[in-house]
Amino acid sequence: MAETKIPRATAKRLPIYYRYLNILLDADKKRVSSTELSEAVKVDSATIRRDFSYFGALGKRGYGYDVETLLAFFKKILNQDTLTNVALIGVGNLGHALLNFNFHKNSNVRISAAFDVNEAIANTVQSGVPVYPMTELKKQLIEQQIEIAILTVPTTVVQKITDDLVDANVKGIMNFTPLRISVPETVRVQNVDLTNELQTLIYFIEHYGQQLGDNGNDDENETED
């Protein structure tokens, strides 16, 4: 069976569904309707049904969705059975927070290596994660076969480090810097600008007020690719 190509907006919602299905399973819930899912995850039911339709018949009319079956399906789609090692580049305040967090609630993802220019941090272990000097970046990424990296570095060096990541065969970058980095088409970048997100939130509150809808989660219902 050929791999299903789905819109980016749908792909962003899949982990939300998966997380809530785990909650339902823990509560010994056997089945769930799209309406129940909608109320829980704040995504309208039509969007949920459309998202699920990309994967074929996941539910039954009049019955809803079998929680255990649906959870097993999304577990496979989201690669939850495979451990993904991630590199953290930059162990400043944000980097330390990410190391402390280290995706403990998502056991298939972990930061397994960190890198920093600070000699006081390099060659130490922080929150159970080894921190290497930046001079070892490419070597360690290649040897450890790490293909995902998180960037929390100054904007003055982010593009140079990005180029090094590409040279080390990194396939995906989560960029916490405000700079938009340049990468080949074969590399996926997810930009996370906390300042921009906060400014956007303030703008919507100031200019739209209650027009966003009952829950204000309009972004969860987007349908564009």
Curated annotation (Swiss-Prot):
Keyword Metal-binding in annotation: no
Amino-acid positions noted as binding NAD(+) in the UniProt annotation, renumbered to this chain: G90, V91, G92, N93, L94, G95
UniProt-listed InterPro entries: CoA-bd, NAD(P)-bd_dom_sf, Rex_DNA-bd_C_dom, Tscrpt_rep_Rex, WH-like_DNA-bd_sf, WH_DNA-bd_sf
Gene3D superfamilies: NAD(P)-binding Rossmann-like Domain, Winged helix-like DNA-binding domain superfamily/Winged helix DNA-binding domain
Pfam families: CoA_binding, Put_DNA-bind_N
Top-rank taxon: Bacteria
Location relative to the cell: Cytoplasm
SMART domains xrefs: CoA_binding
Broad class of the protein's primary localization: cytoplasm
Residues of the DNA-binding region: 16-55
One of the protein's GO biological processes: negative regulation of DNA-templated transcription
Keywords on record: Cytoplasm, DNA-binding, NAD, Repressor, Transcription, Transcription regulation
KW Lipid metabolism (keyword) present: no
Alphabetized GO MF terms: DNA binding; DNA-binding transcription factor activity
Entry GO CC: cytoplasm
Cross-referenced PANTHER family: REDOX-SENSING TRANSCRIPTIONAL REPRESSOR REX, REDOX-SENSING TRANSCRIPTIONAL REPRESSOR REX 1
Task performed by this protein: Modulates transcription in response to changes in cellular NADH/NAD(+) redox state.
Subunit text: Homodimer.
Family to which this protein belongs: Belongs to the transcriptional regulatory Rex family.
Protein known as: Redox-sensing transcriptional repressor Rex
Organism: Lactiplantibacillus plantarum (strain ATCC BAA-793 / NCIMB 8826 / WCFS1)
